[in-house]
Amino acid sequence: MDTLLSLQAVPAAAAIGGPVVAIGGITLFFIREYVKDQRKKSSSFPPPPKVPGLPVIGNLLQLKEKKPHKTFTKWSEKYGPIYSIRTGANTMIVLNTNDVAKEAMITKYSSISTRKLSKALTILTSDKSIVAMSDYNEFYKAAKRHLLTSTLGPTAQKRHRVHRNLMINNICDQFLAHAKMYPSEAVNFRKIFQSELFGLSMKQAIGEDVESIYVEDLDTTLSRQEMFKILVVDPMEGAIDVDWRDFFPYLKWIPNQHFENKIQQMHFHREAVMKALIEQQKKRIASGKAINCYLDHLLSEAADTLSEQQILMLLWEAIIEASDTTLVTTEWAMYELSKDPKRQNYLLSEIQNACGFDQLNEEKLCRLPYLAAIFQETLRKHSPVPVVPLRYVHEETQLGGYTIPEGSEIAINIYGCNMDKNVWDSPEEWRPERFVFGKDDTTELHKTMAFGGGKRVCAGALQAMTISCIAIGRLVQELEWRLGDGEEANVDTLGLTTHKLHPLQTIIKPRLRDRVCVS
């Protein structure tokens, strides 16, 4: 009987509860709409200007040339420093001046601290398992602390100086050897510099520069050049690959097999090589041979808090970051100096005044303001990362006098910031003097925003500046540089980056080496 009564009570309860639930739902709906309306009324900030686009696809066709930083900069001349575009189903807010970029990176950071990654970057970063692409959370704080403590912080940089000195000496020796053997032939700057940077990154990350390694998962032995391709070149190319589903999330269920297979294969090969390198070094550690490197630090200090996959990814990040961004800045700086004998000679005079007949070293860098200005000006004109990886607005905020809605993407156009005619006089010109004789302070490392700002400032900024400056200084001190035939017009860049599309080709001539003594 009780059971029957209970069964009879069900429809009665439903009959009473249905309207109650409906009324409650309607009430909550109106309350939510009222709160939204009040927020809009209380805000005196309008939405950003919109760049006109097409239905459904928005502004995608206007970005098809794959150099969005330049398109963004052109649009800023018409729509202002902050505006809104549509990339398919997504709303993107583009920031084009230092003021609004700093506001986003520092003042309003708490509202936009989440990274918005493409499908390719999600796979290649193992779902944000590296410092540069993670959200601002406990993993980010711990991982960055380990990176600074072991590798990139000031104290760690002093410990790794021996590796940098060896790298710079090797670079100079190779260029000098080429100049003596082939005095009239252009040298491929990137080939030499890139190889030595990769060696440095390997020493700092895993303890040694590996010439070859057997990779069990691939059942093959890889050369150093093959490792470089798998660990650096392929991921860099994959990171800028576009999956059309990124622009239409509601269609992500549709397969894109060619894209997925390509990126997953890069991911598999990268992991296979990193596992082989780590296992090789674990055997070295087990034998009792300790080396001051990132791997040894992570295994001794973070093995209990980080997974094996996270450790693998952090080590890979240290390799690819050191191998790539410093190269971009240094190659462009040498391009600019090679086509400008007057400024090259001015730098040489500064080095000679500071060092006399001694070889330039890191202690002397603080006495070379023009060299620092060359580094800063190259960062400004040829920023290694022209657009900061997208961020996600997880709560409504205000930027630059506009209301930024929740759910928007934020794109900080570093290239546009550094081409702002309201801040920089003749920004299209490479003119280091603007950082020496003007109001700009050459000690302000983040003036050009190339290394970000606030809590997400680039951990490798100090190392990048040190390596690039000492390399530029030593190369100018020991060699005379001029561009090869047709090289001055060779300024095309690779895809979404500011990488020089074709490696720098220069004619070099040794200076009076007997006047440069090793100190």
Swiss-Prot record:
This is Ent-kaurene oxidase. Pathway: Plant hormone biosynthesis; gibberellin biosynthesis. GO terms for biological process: ent-kaurene oxidation to kaurenoic acid; gibberellin biosynthetic process. Belongs to the cytochrome P450 family. It is a single-pass membrane protein. Pfam families: p450. Its EC number is 1.14.14.86. Gene3D superfamilies: Cytochrome P450. Residues 32-519 are cytoplasmic. InterPro entries: Cyt_P450, Cyt_P450_CS, Cyt_P450_E_grp-I, Cyt_P450_sf, KO_chloroplastic. Keywords: Chloroplast, Heme, Iron, Membrane, Metal-binding, Monooxygenase, Oxidoreductase, Plastid, Plastid outer membrane, Transmembrane, Transmembrane helix. It comes from the Eukaryota. The chain crosses the membrane at residues 11-31. Its main location: plastid. GO terms for cellular component: chloroplast outer membrane; endoplasmic reticulum. Heme binds at residue 458. Residues 1-10 are chloroplast intermembrane. It is found in: Plastid, Chloroplast outer membrane.
